[in-house]
Design a protein with these regions (language model features):
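Membrane-interface "cap" regions at the ends of multi-pass membrane proteins
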Residues: 1-39, 94-95, 199, 235-239
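Flexible loop linkers connecting adjacent transmembrane helices
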Residues: 3-10, 43-48, 71-96, 121, ...
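Juxtamembrane transmembrane-helix boundary signature
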Residues: 31, 58-90, 99-110
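Extracellular/periplasmic helix-exit of transmembrane alpha-helices
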Residues: 65-79, 220-224, 229, 249-278
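Hydrophobic transmembrane alpha-helices that form the core helical bundles
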Residues: 75, 97-128, 135-139, 303-322, ...
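Loop-to-transmembrane helix boundary motifs in multi-pass membrane proteins
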Residues: 94-95, 132-135, 246, 292, ...
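Transmembrane alpha-helical segments of multi-pass small-molecule transport proteins
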Residues: 101, 126-148, 164-169, 327-346, ...
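Hydrophobic alpha-helical segments and their helix-loop junctions in multi-pass secondary transporters
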Residues: 162-189, 204-220, 375-384, 409-418
């Protein structure tokens, strides 16, 4: 039985309205965590420090792409009652569905590696702890949180983490002077300054992550409302869209804040930033110790929260192989979580240069993502799977276009990484 069965109907009022929409908010924010993970931090600070406000539009475009794809995969979970992994097992040929799910699980390990490293880097900034020991502490903290808390508690914790990250960047922005007219132009008027193509491609190609597609289709089922049949599905689809839109806008705001901070400090002083530790160290003389420490704390929260969601996604993917829903008390979900985080931790410990692991991580994600995205679109475009809620032809065309675009960007990034 899914862990989401713990959400009793008595938790929800019978009258549906604005308050119910507010109470529905949650699954999208867990997905947003993957949108503001340490990997995105690195890309955003590189974009802001090298090209000022001119690449803010990339965050806007990537957010629109993410809203469309995440909204679509959430539909799969609501209509079928299955996560992407379960749906692939049920509706795809064995020779196709299961290999894609296994590759998705490998991608979740790669994601966990990057997220754990983010937490470890933050601990090194704050306390001087070595990267391996910081990775061990981050992993241990995440495992304890996952195995000692219900989904509802974890959701509240993640929402709290995202809120604190947002407040941290709001504080940082108060300390700097931003030419808002220039920033607004950068956010909505595309431009590609000379030498910026690699960063543009990196941000656009990395925004959609395989584990988030699996995760969203699972956790959207945590919501129940006092309706049945078609009326229930219609209402949940509307509520889900509000949740996804609201959550992705928050992700857009936080990512934009990173570029704004980098542009107003590093770019304004002609400083190039290539690593997060370098960014934190350079904030001290520019904005003071408080700004640097808050930066590190926000990174730690991002690392922990994104490791939690990557672990949950791994549990969902692995359980789906056995046609089971995610349940943190179920053996297959537990095995998926432990394998994903454990293998990622071992790679960090035994790799001579842990940051080479990030390159390997990006390569694995670039190879796997096209399979997951095309699997998702094929399932949601199938009347056998979705019934009357199958994608419209225009929606299918748009989704396949986005799938091809994201796949092309990731293949291009893979070639660049190999070079």
């Amino acid at each position: 039985m899914s862990i989401f069965k713990e959400l009793k109907r008595s938790d929800h009022p019978r009258v549906l309205g604005a308050i119910d929409i507010f109470k529905y908010i949650g699954p999208g924010l867990l997905v947003t965590v993957g949108f503001i993970d340490p990997g995105n931090w690195a890309s955003n600070f590189a974009a802001g420090s090298d090209f000022g406000y001119s690449l803010l539009w990339v965050v806007t475009l990537s957010t629109i792409m993410l809203i469309i794809l995440q909204h679509n995969v959430a539909h799969l979970g609501i209509v079928t009652g299955l996560c992407l992994s379960e749906a692939a097992v049920k509706y795809s040929p064995k020779w196709l569905g299961r290999p894609i799910i296994v590759s998705g699980f490998l991608a979740s390990i790669s994601t966990s590696l990057a997220e754990i490293l983010g937490g470890a880097i933050a601990l090194q900034m704050l306390f001087g702890i070595s990267i391996p020991n910081g990775a061990l502490l981050t992993t241990a903290a995440v495992l304890i949180m996952l195995f000692t808390n219900s989904y509802k508690r974890m959701e509240k914790a993640i929402i709290g983490f995202v809120s604190m990250i947002g407040l941290a960047f709001l504080y940082e922005l108060i300390l700097v002077d931003i030419p808002w007219e220039t920033a607004l132009k950068g956010a909505f008027i595309p431009s590609v300054p000379q030498g910026s193509l690699m960063i543009v491609m990196s941000v656009l190609g990395a925004v959609v992550m395989p584990h988030n597609l699996f995760l969203h289709s699972e956790i959207v089922q945590s919501r129940e409302i006092y309706l049945k049949g078609e009326e229930r599905i219609k209402k949940m689809l509307k509520y889900e869209f509000v949740d996804t839109l609201f959550s992705m806008i928050i992700g857009w705001a936080i990512n934009s804040a990173m570029i704004l901070l980098a542009a107003s400090t590093f770019f304004a002083h002609g400083e190039h930033v290539s690593e997060l530790a370098q960014a934190q160290a350079m904030l001290t003389p520019l904005l003071g110790n408080n700004a640097a420490n808050i930066f590190a704390i926000a990174l730690l929260l991002a690392g922990i929260s994104s490791t939690i969601t990557s672990g949950m996604a791994a549990g969902s993917i692995f359980a789906g192989l056995f046609n089971e829903a995610y349940n943190v008390k179920d053996a297959h979900s537990i095995i998926g979580i432990v394998l994903s985080l454990g293998i990622a931790l071992l790679v960090i410990f035994f790799l001579g240069d842990p940051f080479k692991g990030l390159i390997v991580s990006k390569m694995v994600l670039s190879i796997q993502l096209p399979f997951t995205v095309f699997l998702q679109v094929s399932l949601t475009s199938s009347k056998r799977v979705m019934g009357r809620y199958v994608n419209r032809k225009s929606t299918t065309i748009l989704l396949y276009f986005l799938a091809a675009l994201v796949s092309g960007l990731n293949i291009w990034l893979l070639i660049e990484l190999i070079k």
